[in-house]
Amino acid sequence: MIVVKVGGSVICKDLSKVVENLPKYAGEAVVVHGGGCLVNELLKRMGIEPKFLTHPGGVVSRYTDLETLKVFVMAMSWINKQLVASLFARGVEAVGLTGADGGVVRARRKEKVLVVDERGRQRVVDGGYVGKIVDVNVKALAPPPLKVLAPIAVSEKGELLNVDGDQLAFEVAARAGAGRLVILSDVDGLILGGRVVPRLTPEEAEELAKSEEVRGGMKRKLLMAAEAARRGVEVVISNGLADSPIDAALGGAGTHISRNI
């Protein structure tokens, strides 16, 4: 199995290259998608300012109250069905799911989270409707047919929860024993000193994620890639806007994180 994570930065810029390349892998892939850019756009149209939390270590996450959750579910559902329809037009009968469908992805609501405020002080705040994944029904996701999964989970209490798309992709890959996980973003990989870092061990990825050299969403990607690599998954962070992006990633493009460097 190959897990392909399509980031929101790709979805909101140009998804065509990914959609054109995916049919080649329809019999062996699971697709997980993001879409934070559309969530932000819809929130602003509704007069709601998107809110984000900075955690110790510099990782940033979306604060999801009930109103934000409603918009999040709406945006992810739209992206999910558009992606399924685009694949259908190319001869792929994909099935679009959220993690809540059939309890495919179960999560525990984070009631409290530790954050760093604008003054650099650590404090505990309400966790909102954000979940930590506790179980994934990988049998339900096994291809064929190709499953397209949105990052919405369900709690034991029946609550819909926002789960991080990268975290979901890593969990699916690790729990399913996938050989490879391709993370498609709008950058060529981890870039340091103006150059793409071609290969990292899990230890190197984790060390860089905790350093000041790496910022933004790449911190979370490297931390989760390190954990997935320790569990036997080769992770590739590559450019989803490139020609044949999945082919390119599996052929050596981007940054590869693996125990077998």
Curated annotation (Swiss-Prot):
Example of a GO MF term: acetylglutamate kinase activity
Binding site for substrate: G35, G36, R62, N162
Assigned keywords, A-Z: Amino-acid biosynthesis, Arginine biosynthesis, ATP-binding, Cytoplasm, Kinase, Lysine biosynthesis, Nucleotide-binding, Transferase
The protein's name: Putative [LysW]-aminoadipate/[LysW]-glutamate kinase
Catalytic activity: [amino-group carrier protein]-C-terminal-N-(1,4-dicarboxybutan-1-yl)-L-glutamine + ATP = [amino-group carrier protein]-C-terminal-N-(1-carboxy-5-phosphooxy-5-oxopentan-1-yl)-L-glutamine + ADP; [amino-group carrier protein]-C-terminal-gamma-(L-glutamyl)-L-glutamate + ATP = [amino-group carrier protein]-C-terminal-gamma-(5-phospho-L-glutamyl)-L-glutamate + ADP
Annotated site (Transition state stabilizer): K5, K221
HAMAP family associated with the record: LysZ (MF_02082)
Organism: Pyrobaculum calidifontis (strain DSM 21063 / JCM 11548 / VA1)
EC number(s) recorded for this UniProt protein: 2.7.2.17, 2.7.2.19
GO terms under cellular component: cytoplasm
UniProt-annotated location(s): Cytoplasm
InterPro entries, sorted: AceGlu_kinase-like_sf, AcgluKinase_fam, Asp/Glu/Uridylate_kinase, Glu/AcGlu_kinase, LysZ
Protein purpose: Involved in both the arginine and lysine biosynthetic pathways. Phosphorylates the LysW-bound precursors glutamate (for arginine biosynthesis), respectively alpha-aminoadipate (for lysine biosynthesis).
Gene that this polypeptide is encoded by: lysZ
Family classification: Belongs to the acetylglutamate kinase family. LysZ subfamily.
Top-level taxon of the source organism: Archaea
Lineage start: Archaea, Thermoproteota, Thermoprotei, Thermoproteales, Thermoproteaceae
